A protein has these predicted regions:
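Generic hydrophobic, amphipathic alpha-helix propensity
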Residues: 21-30, 47, 72-76, 80, ...
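Hydrophobic alpha-helical connector segments
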Residues: 71, 85-111, 165-169
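Helix-turn-helix
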Residues: 25, 29, 33-67, 71
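Short coil/turn segments at alpha/beta junctions that flank glycine-rich nucleotide-binding fingerprints
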Residues: 36-40, 91, 112, 154
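Hydrophobic/aromatic-rich alpha-helical bundle segments in the mid-to-C-terminal region
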Residues: 116-120, 130-134, 152-198, 206-209
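Amphipathic alpha-helical packing segments from all-alpha helical-bundle domains
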Residues: 75-86, 128-153, 163-167, 193
Length: 209
């Protein structure tokens, strides 16, 4: 005798909003614990306790700690990084495109010590999840490399392997997560300007427009 499939009742807008709010709360609390204790030292039990919820409820939202880290990565990229890429792609001048990208990326990395966790713990994700995160960064790579190539072809940029220059520029911004003093947020704008100026002054021929 066949069982009749049960139709799940669709969520109301209020229920959907509550779910989104709860997910955001879980992501933030988990990320706070990853920053405070380290990813490896943080258990799902600790996260559930900090949220004042039972573990089964936490597993309803995320089946594993690795999946939770992945969802936090995606959420952060969608909210903070992808908008930078969208903005950069609309800038026609390649020098201005690089300047915008480097400045915004530096500010993103300097905004919170959570940036260090997300950069460093990419290695803790499964290969499948790493590939999905890397696909977003591949888009950033192509934007930056394309601008480098345009500047070289126009004679404004120094010759050199495009990939080296791309990793050099983005690496300058990303590496600050390992040494920046996050208690000195008033210096982040100065740092962003410096990273941008140092890279462009080293790469561009002076006086060429």
């Amino acid at each position: 005798m066949e069982r009749k499939a049960r139709n799940k009742k669709p969520k109301t807008p209020s229920e959907t909003n509550n779910t989104i709010h709860r997910q955001a709360e879980i992501y933030q609390k988990a990320l706070d614990l990853f920053v405070e204790k380290g990813y490896d030292a943080t258990s799902m039990s600790m996260i559930a306790k900090a949220l004042k919820m039972c573990k089964p409820n936490l597993y309803y939202y995320c089946p594993s700690k690795e999946e939770l880290l992945y969802q936090i990565h995606l959420d952060d990229l969608q909210k903070r990084f992808i908008p930078i890429l969208d903005e950069a792609e609309k800038i026609r001048d390649p020098e201005a495109r690089i300047a915008h990208f480097l400045r915004r990326l530096t500010l993103m990395c300097a905004a919170s010590p959570a940036a260090q966790v997300l950069v460093h713990e990419l290695r803790s994700l499964s290969k499948t999840h790493q590939r999905q995160i890397s696909a977003v960064w591949r888009r950033a790579y192509e934007i930056f490399r394309g601008a480098i190539k345009e500047l070289q072809q126009s004679g404004r940029g120094r010759k050199g392997r495009e990939s080296f220059l791309t990793f050099l520029g983005t690496g300058m911004a990303l590496w600050i997560v390992y040494w920046f003093n996050y208690s000195e947020q008033n210096h982040s704008e100065e740092l962003a300007d410096l990273v941008t100026q140092v890279f462009l002054k080293g790469f561009l021929y002076p006086g060429k427009k």
